[in-house]
Amino acid sequence: MFALVERQTGQVVGFGGLIHFAGRGEPEIKYALLRAAWGRGLATEAACALLDFARDRGLPEVIATVDPQHGASQRVLAKAGMERGELRDEEDGTQTQMFYWRAVPR
């Protein structure tokens, strides 16, 4: 995980990274921002940087899981270049919206 630091202030405003859950073949992008940092493009910037990080390390695919009701996070992932996938039924009865990214050589 990486700290997300606002350039202007030097303050940590969130975190982001790629995590690899046991039993899954591809890493998953995760990020979170303080509410005060929402709406300024920081999540999109972080997601793009994390996907660049994945590409630079030769990772062929990254996934993301999002609450189907969380439109802002879905827009962030789409802007970062991820493609919306299927709705996945979870063991606890909830659903998760899947997003996928596949590396394209530069």
Feature-to-residue mapping (PLM):
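Acyl-donor (CoA/ACP) binding surface of acyl/acetyltransferases
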Residues: M1-R106
